[in-house]
Amino acid sequence: MRRAKIVCTLGPATDGYDRTKALVDAGMDIARFNLSHGTHAEHEERYQQVRKASDETGHSVGLLADLQGPKIRLGRFTEGPVLLERGDTFTLTVEPGAEGDRHQCGTTYPGLADDVTPGERVLVDDGKVCLQVTGIDGPRIHTTVVEGGIVSDHKGLNLPGVAVSVPALSDKDEADLRWALRTGFDIVALSFVRSGRDIDDVHRIMDEEGRRLPVIAKIEKPQAVDALDDIVAAFDGIMVARGDLGVEMPLEQVPIVQKRAITLARRNAKPVIVATQMLDSMIDHSRPTRAEASDVANAVIDGTDAVMLSGETSVGKYPVETVRTMAKIVEAAEEDVLAHGLPPLTEHNKPRTQGGAVARAAAEIGDFLGARFLVAFTQSGDTARRLSRYRSPIPLLAFTPEPATRSQLNLTWGVETFLGPHADSTDAMVDQVDELLLRYGRCRKGDTVVITAGSPPGVSGSTNLVRVHHIGEDDTPH
């Protein structure tokens, strides 16, 4: 059983029900909808295809709506892409409606002229083109091309070291968020997060719509790295988005940030995704490079909950093969990690709450007894996430009456989720475990499982109970 989850970005290469179902069969756990591209109608069709494929295969798939965020972009070039050569002069302008040519182009960010100063760099298209600011004349930012290349419509701009004053949510993001909430998505990701306070507007809109979802903070700005503790505390999970992060800060720092982010998220029992260019060469080739295989494996060894595919699945030539390849790499890395048994407690992972201590006790009891499964009964997913963070080699099953929780736990390491009725007592929990695990052939009579839950049942965040149970046997104390 693979423990780390796979997030796949949907796009033109995955369109059509048969392709979507093939992704699910190959191992997709979370379908990511990149709302920077496409229309609501296109995304709605993909949404329906994923839900149908999930129902038909019986493989739960969570749906993640990834908001564009305050991404600064170029405007439109009147006559198509333009080649900028080293030493050329090029002007960025915030004048409304400015058309682009080989001498100038507009930008989506009206405050650009106020935020940059001469000498600073402006990077275009993830750093492929580098401009240096030479002067500012009202709404016009004059630059010299330091590294040339082709620029075209709506390419992204990065301003390394510049604290831009854009809001956390654009008007487009608000419209996309409301659409995602009404459509029925399971998880939301917020781009270009800079502080824990950035979640406030998202929660305000969710409350207006009457639906709170987990919000994942994308770590892709130096300000986010500086505020990582604050962000992990405020958000429901994080994504290490290495594309923009590697443009905004020195490349050699990105692996260090990745390891720190994974450690911090695990300490707080929050899911963490490692993303961007994991199997990038498979956009065009049927096999990854050795370095890419090592990258995926090392993210798993570091302890990430999930690894993500972007262009590899959304526009690549081999989307299904890429998912299969990633699954094989993950499983091979985990075979080595899990062979070491239950990881010992350290200063970084020791429990700091009652729920965390109870979850650790369940993991250790399971280890001592050679349990077949650890079982978490959970309303919100909290109990399962607390158990997951200890990375026990014993498979972890979550039982929940909430369909949304089932989908959301697809992002958490090692959790396989069963949907069942609300259990109003510990005896009802035991009966449900016996029935489902025997029905699906997951256990034999007499197998040991360790159950953890909250008592009274149904109270979110109240993990306080551990029970050792032998499948199919009445082990209630008399």
Q: Over which residues does each language-model region extend?
A:
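Non-catalytic helical/linker scaffolds that mediate oligomerization, partner binding
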Residues: 1-478
